[in-house]
Amino acid sequence: MAIIFLVTFIGLMGFGIILPLFPFYAERMGASPEIITLTMAAFSLGQFVAAPLWGRLSDSIGRKPVLILTLLGSSLSYVILAYAPNLTVVILSRILSGLMAGNISIAFAYVTDITDDSNRAAGLGKVSAALGLGFMTGPAIGGLLAGNSVENANYLLTAWAAAGINFVAMVAAIVFLKESLDA
């Protein structure tokens, strides 16, 4: 259970790292306020479309491989964001990031697999806490990494930090996470 907490926490922390700077980054790329809003919503659209598909796939091939794939894809989406040459690539990176955000629903499915009626609520509560803690710490870390000026913010470092954190979560899942459908 501790590893799924850690993987969930790290995944949400990686997502949150870029949030405080993203509107400024998109604006620097020439986005209007409306496009910035749509670009941020692109993540949610990708997540909305992909989460049920990831869930179905994890039911058939297992939670662990799908979790690893989504964490790898999330990491890749932040690398693409780091080197996006234009606004179109920024938007595509956010859609890819959303498509790869299936790890949240998979974490809940994993906990449901490994718990019973006596400890399921506690297990799901721990995953929810990991989500909240990751989402709280990510923006704080992103703000610290960016520096003290929006004009001179280090967007590359924050995107790479998000990629790196998701990669660490993926490695942790590979090394420490047991497949729950075999449990």
Question: Which functions belong to the PLM regions below?
Answer:
Residues M1-F24:
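Pair of pore-lining "gating" transmembrane helices in MFS-fold secondary transporters
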Residues F9, S77, T88-G102:
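Hydrophobic core of transmembrane alpha-helices in multi-pass small-molecule transporters
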Residues G16, S44-P52, G102, F135-M136:
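Residue-level signature of mid-helix packing/kink "hotspots" within the transmembrane helices
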Residues F43, L71-Y78, I165-A169:
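MFS 12-TM fold signature
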Residues F48-L87:
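Conserved MFS/SLC helix-loop-helix module at the cytosolic interface between two early adjacent transmembrane helices
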Residues S93-L131:
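Cytoplasmic helix-loop-helix junction between adjacent transmembrane helices
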Residues V127-V175:
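Helix-loop-helix hairpin linking two adjacent transmembrane segments in secondary transporters
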Residues I174-A183:
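Flexible cytoplasmic inter-helical loops of multi-pass small-molecule transporters
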